[in-house]
Amino acid sequence: KLNQNLGPVKWSSNLVYSRNRNKVVDMLDSYKLSNGTVISQDSMVMGGTTGVKMVLREGGQIGDIYVNTLKTDEHGAIWVSPTGSNVAPAKDTWIYAGNSNPSYTLSWRNEFNWKGLSLGFMFNARVGGVGVSLTQAAMDYFGVSERTATDRLNGGALVNGQRIPAENYYQTIGGNGADAIGACY
């Protein structure tokens, strides 16, 4: 914090830096319901949608994001139908996309006082962290995003070095939520 009197003007400035590092060290191994059923879990889904979820698991962090992905072949390449026109979502295959928490936040606040009048302003920065845009996924599904237009003009979406119809590709990934990986920023 800095305070300075500049004649009739009083200036106050604050700079705040914060960082949060966390790690899930231990989770409850099992618990017993009132009806006697024992529940065991090694992870806990904290929320999500069709193709995106936040998961707590030992060794991970609060804010870890997992996204659904596309079906792959035995070599790990994205599976394309024999006709070359479709891809398919992978059933219950989730990959780590990143963490929603910022690496750090920074704020700088200034206030000027003069004859009973006060003027203040603040700059904030949230640096790092992964976000997921379900709006981007929906726009891709309906074919109204810039990248769907580009792929339509280029003859289709490029998958494994070959073009497949953009409509088929984006309706598969956008409708399934698999597009969340493409909509991460």
Each PLM stretch: what is its role?
Residues G116-F121:
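Repeated loop/turn-to-beta-strand initiation elements of outer-membrane beta-barrel proteins
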Residues V16-N20, N113, N124-R126:
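Outer-membrane beta-barrel pore domains and translocons
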Residues L2-S100, A138-Y185:
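Conserved small-residue
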Residues S30, N124-V127, V132-M139:
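Short Gly/aromatic-enriched secondary-structure transition segments
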Residues G7, N113-K115:
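Short strand-coil-strand connectors
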